[in-house]
A protein has these predicted regions:
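Short, Lys/Arg-enriched anionic-surface-contact patches
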Residues: 5-26, 72-75
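Long, charge-rich, low-complexity alpha-helical segments
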Residues: 27-30, 34-76
């Protein structure tokens, strides 16, 4: 298991190696998609038995990854 950031890890044996909330099988992707659907942090905590700190760690992990990417528009 690799710790990718605080509260986020990846293991090829867990969820096909996708980043998950450490100690769970909840992918960061699921947390982000659920937030994007307008579900509150409190509701996500209850649904997935997570803490607010874990949710915010997932958001920070994703923000860090996006900030390091370079995007270019494709020409038509």
């Amino acid at each position: 298991m690799d710790t990718l950031s605080e509260n986020v890890s990846a293991d090829p044996e867990v969820m096909h190696g996708k980043p998950v909330i450490e100690g769970t099988r909840v992918p960061v992707e699921v947390v982000l998609n659920t937030l994007a659907e307008g579900v509150s942090i409190e509701e996500i905590c209850k649904e997935y038995d997570l803490s607010e700190e874990q949710i915010l760690s997932a958001v920070n992990f994703a923000a860090d990854k996006v900030s390091k990417e370079e995007y270019r528009a494709l020409e038509a």
